[in-house]
Swiss-Prot record:
PANTHER family: UPF0234 PROTEIN YAJQ
Protein name: Nucleotide-binding protein Acid345_2028
Keywords: Nucleotide-binding
Keyword Nucleotide-binding among record annotations: yes
Classification of source organism: Bacteria, Pseudomonadati, Acidobacteriota, Terriglobia, Terriglobales
Role summary: Nucleotide-binding protein.
GO molecular function terms listed in the Swiss-Prot or TrEMBL record: nucleotide binding
NCBIfam families per record: PRK05412.1
InterPro entries, alphabetized: DUF520, UPF0234-like_C, UPF0234_N, YajQ-like_sf
GO cellular component assignments: cytosol
Domain of life according to the entry: Bacteria
Similarity field: Belongs to the YajQ family.
Amino acid sequence: MADNSFDIVSKIDLQEVSNAIQQATKEIQTRFDLKDTKSEIKLEKDAIELHSSDEYKLKAVTDILQGKLVKRNVPLKGLTYGTIESAAGATVRQKITMQQGIPGEKAKEIVRVIKDSKKKAQASIQGDTVRVSSKDRDTLQEIIALIKNKDFGIDVQFTNYRSN
């Protein structure tokens, strides 16, 4: 019988992040408490940079951005917040890095959980994804349920279902 497989990945949809940033920017420009505060949100390759006039206003900008990201189904677990630091012109900034791919130690932890479950499935790390294969589709569904119930500190998605 042929093997069935799927990949466990951790990715953020950058188009949805871009849309959320545009919506948050519009709200910042129209909110009374944030007018004339030099508050802005910039999207970089794998990070979001927030600027504002002080920490209180930066926190408000962060809350607006988080609300817009949640509405667009972008997982907040995939974001890592940097420290708030002083910037030029008496402003503060914060960098938020976006998780793209599963880090090595988290991938090893996922593989260990699958192996410890004693299910008849093989898990292997392939770059920044974890491939799980088994002869039985039901076993794969049980593993998906197992992984969803565990908290690895990252957001995981299941993609690339294959039946060979």
